[in-house]
């Protein structure tokens, strides 16, 4: 059986009050429309078509790696009109098409699979997704036959007294036999107060043709649409709970999961402990037995097993197993830190490689450098990597001891097994096995304060 999907992503999203199309706003690190696309893919649906309109180029840019096709809806004349705009996608296809909305990011791949299975096994012409809610005010009601089939969808304003008591509501997501849908679209009109073409009318047309219409009931959170920043926040809360629950089931400890923020594509190994206030973003991979103390942010990075991070920021970098980072360290993009290293408080590392067992304990800046293993950086060391025009490189070998308050003026090389005296400004290569001293000789002028009249008596 051939299955495909159409995702409606042309809405203007006026209530978002944004220059961006609504569907590219993110929920837990991923655009809403990409949540829908990815879950459709997980349900083994290969052919996906996006109906786009406002901000179409922006939507294309955010979905360009998703292998989807596009249909253009120049004017937004209703959901039915949006599907009409995708007729070319459906042309010459036979099978089943599901229709989803790009602003409902909480739909799961399990529900999508259930929708197709229910529709195809029951040989329905149309199947819709519904939900039961305590307060259905404002929603279209699902009215069923005694057999359980869907009889009709009635908009709230058109409900009679009995229909108002119904708490099963329409989600705006459907499954259709493609041939039935295309035939029904030919009979769709915009004879209503808004002058729009409604997809709900296709259900009525299908029913009048004598075809079966079914419905599956899912939790309300799965059909939640996002039309405002408030609803975006509500969707974020639901998604975050799902994400954190998944990690806890997989063996991750959260001290307070309500105040831990993890993007949907993050992977975390078992026996890792996460304290409140941590933010883990992008495609970060955290291995087992790590400890992330409060107020740490990690984005698009790989963290080895047994790493401890405390009150620090790690961006687009790799941290080797057994390393400790922080408190208050800043690991900038393109940094690779080896195993069992120590990156301490108020240390900033940018676009550098740090070897195994190297200690950079406090108040140090390292940029555009290659640092070997078992090195020690004293407090206040600065790699002076910028000459006013471009960044220069510093190379430090293994077992180098860098004294406190040292400036390494790039480009410069410090070879293996070297010492640099505290307070030095290094501008030339330091040979292997040597001690480098680059500071002025101390001069003591005895009696100077008394001569200047500065000595307090």
Curated annotation (Swiss-Prot):
Keywords: Acyltransferase, Cell shape, Cell wall biogenesis/degradation, Cytoplasm, Magnesium, Metal-binding, Multifunctional enzyme, Nucleotidyltransferase, Peptidoglycan synthesis, Repeat, Transferase
EC numbers: 2.7.7.23, 2.3.1.157
Binding site for Mg(2+): 103, 227
Pathway: Nucleotide-sugar biosynthesis; UDP-N-acetyl-alpha-D-glucosamine biosynthesis; N-acetyl-alpha-D-glucosamine 1-phosphate from alpha-D-glucosamine 6-phosphate (route II): step 2/2; Nucleotide-sugar biosynthesis; UDP-N-acetyl-alpha-D-glucosamine biosynthesis; UDP-N-acetyl-alpha-D-glucosamine from N-acetyl-alpha-D-glucosamine 1-phosphate: step 1/1; Bacterial outer membrane biogenesis; LPS lipid A biosynthesis
Any Pfam family the entry gives: Hexapep
Record localization: Cytoplasm
GO CC list: cytoplasm; membrane
Domain of life, source organism: Bacteria
CDD domains the record matches: GT2_GlmU_N_bac, LbH_GlmU_C
The protein's assembly and partners: Homotrimer.
The protein, known as: Bifunctional protein GlmU
């Amino acid at each position: 059986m051939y299955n495909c999907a159409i995702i409606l992503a042309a809405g203007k999203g006026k209530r978002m009050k944004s220059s961006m199309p609504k569907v590219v706003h993110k929920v837990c690190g991923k655009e809403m429309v990409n949540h829908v696309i990815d879950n459709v893919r997980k349900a083994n649906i290969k052919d996906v078509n996006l109906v786009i309109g406002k901000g179409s180029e922006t939507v294309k840019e955010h979905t360009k790696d998703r292998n989807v096709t596009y249909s253009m809806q120049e004017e937004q004349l209703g959901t039915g009109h949006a599907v009409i705009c995708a007729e070319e996608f459906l042309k010459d296809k036979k099978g089943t098409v599901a229709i989803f909305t790009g602003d409902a990011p909480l739909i799961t791949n399990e529900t999508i699979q259930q929708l197709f299975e229910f529709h195809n096994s029951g040989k329905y012409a149309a199947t819709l997704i519904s939900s039961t809610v305590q307060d259905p005010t404002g929603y279209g009601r699902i009215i069923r036959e005694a057999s359980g089939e869907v009889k009709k969808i009635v908009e709230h304003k058109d409900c009679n007294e009995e229909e108002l008591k119904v708490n099963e509501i329409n989600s705006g997501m459907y499954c259709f036999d493609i041939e039935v849908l295309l035939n029904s679209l030919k009979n769709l009109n915009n004879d209503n107060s808004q002058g729009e073409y409604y997809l709900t009318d296709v259900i009525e047309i299908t029913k009048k043709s004598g075809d079966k219409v079914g419905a599956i009931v899912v939790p309300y959170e799965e059909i939640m649409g996002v039309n405002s920043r408030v609803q975006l926040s509500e969707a974020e809360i639901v998604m975050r709970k799902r994400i954190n629950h998944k990690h806890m089931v997989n063996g991750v400890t959260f001290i307070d999961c309500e105040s831990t923020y993890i993007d949907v594509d993050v992977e975390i190994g078992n026996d890792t402990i996460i304290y409140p206030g941590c933010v883990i973003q992008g495609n970060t991979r955290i291995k087992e037995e790590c400890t992330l103390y409060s107020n740490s942010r990690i984005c698009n990075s790989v963290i080895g097993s047994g790493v401890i991070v405390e009150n620090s920021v790690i961006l687009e970098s790799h941290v080797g197993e057994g390393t400790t980072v922080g408190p208050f360290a800043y690991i900038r993009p393109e940094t690779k830190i080896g195993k069992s290293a120590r990156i301490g408080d108020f240390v900033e590392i940018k676009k550098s490689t740090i070897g195994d067992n190297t200690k950079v304990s406090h108040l140090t800046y390292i940029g555009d450098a290659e640092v070997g293993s078992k090195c020690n950086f004293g407090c206040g060391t600065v790699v002076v990597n910028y000459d006013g025009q471009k960044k220069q490189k510093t190379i430090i070998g293994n077992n180098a001891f860098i004294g406190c308050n040292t400036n390494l003026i790039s480009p410069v090389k410090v070879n293996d097994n070297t010492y640099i005296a505290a307070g030095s400004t290094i501008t030339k290569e330091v040979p292997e096995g040597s001690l480098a001293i680059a500071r002025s000789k101390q001069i003591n002028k005895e009696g100077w304060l008394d001569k200047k009249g500065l000595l307090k008596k």
